[in-house]
């Protein structure tokens, strides 16, 4: 058995050396090698002749090769840098097999970019992709699910097995289409995310239990007093933030609800109920 492993490793290293490329798996450098998968991704992207297309983590340029020898070759621009630290240019579409380690921050960097792009066709680790599209009641439904779906429509396009990459990752992959909601929802995202963080910190517990945590109570009381001061509202000496929290939850009929079963409309209604009583999450 050791001999077989040595022979396999030898063949892999020989191929890598022949191409002059060394891949670092710790940095998510798994190169998509199946031309049929690559072509399918390009087709599903439905790129128009006038589109500006952003690709992230081009690897061995398998996607860019599609413009070689065409009238679009002269328009190709390569930018070297950290995508999470760089200002994004204008673009219509984003088509990419991204490093999986940056999946979550990259999704929200794209969705908060202005002006809005039309949509993105991206490759993710399968479990991450399934979290993106998960619905209330699903096992994988989480803060990532609801925050992404607040800002975008998300659709699963295709599954991609790990053997389609070089070197093969330990996980399976999916291609996902993310289309920003245009116009964006009329909501303060920082306020929204503050509420969602509390609710999904323990998504299986009731909201009543989630809002009894000391850190949550302290934060809401501090924010209440700050906003009251900014609006010249006097806070009584006997003010009890816990009573106000319970009042809002009961009024919204949400005290016994659990985050894992609540949808976007449920949380928007709850956020408005808190804000109406002068309670804020930022």
Where are each of the predicted segments found?
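Catalytic cores of RNA-modifying enzymes
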Residues: 1-198, 269-282
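Residues within well-ordered alpha helices
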Residues: 15, 41, 210, 247-248
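An accessory alpha-helical subdomain
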Residues: 173-174, 178-180, 184-245, 251-266, ...
């Amino acid at each position: 058995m050791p001999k077989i492993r040595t022979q396999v490793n030898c063949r892999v290293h020989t191929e890598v050396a022949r191409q002059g490329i060394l891949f670092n798996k710790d940095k998510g450098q798994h190169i998509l090698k199946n031309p049929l998968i690559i072509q399918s991704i390009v087709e599903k992207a439905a790129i128009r002749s006038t589109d500006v297309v952003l690709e992230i983590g081009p690897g061995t340029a398998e996607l860019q090769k599609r413009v070689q020898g065409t009238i679009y070759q002269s328009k190709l621009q390569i930018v070297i840098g950290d995508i999470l630290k760089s200002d994004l240019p204008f673009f219509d579409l984003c088509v990419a097999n991204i490093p999986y380690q940056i999946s979550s921050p990259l999704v929200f960097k794209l969705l908060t970019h202005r002006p809005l792009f039309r949509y993105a066709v991206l490759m993710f680790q399968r479990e991450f992709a399934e979290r993106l599209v998960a619905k209330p009641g699903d096992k994988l439904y989480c803060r990532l699910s609801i925050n992404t779906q607040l800002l975008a429509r998300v659709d699963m396009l295709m599954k991609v097995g790990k053997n389609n990459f070089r070197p093969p990752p330990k996980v399976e992959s999916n291609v996902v289409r993310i289309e920003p909601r245009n116009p964006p929802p009329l909501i303060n995202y920082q306020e929204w995310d503050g509420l969602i963080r509390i609710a999904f910190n323990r998504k299986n517990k009731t909201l009543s239990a989630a809002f009894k945590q000391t850190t949550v109570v302290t934060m809401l009381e501090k924010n209440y007093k700050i906003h009251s001061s900014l609006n010249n509202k006097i806070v009584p000496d006997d003010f009890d933030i816990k009573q106000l929290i319970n009042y809002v939850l009961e009024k919204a009929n949400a005290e016994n609800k659990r985050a894992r079963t609540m949808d976007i409309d449920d949380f928007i209604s709850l956020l408005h109920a808190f804000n109406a009583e002068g309670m804020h999450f930022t």
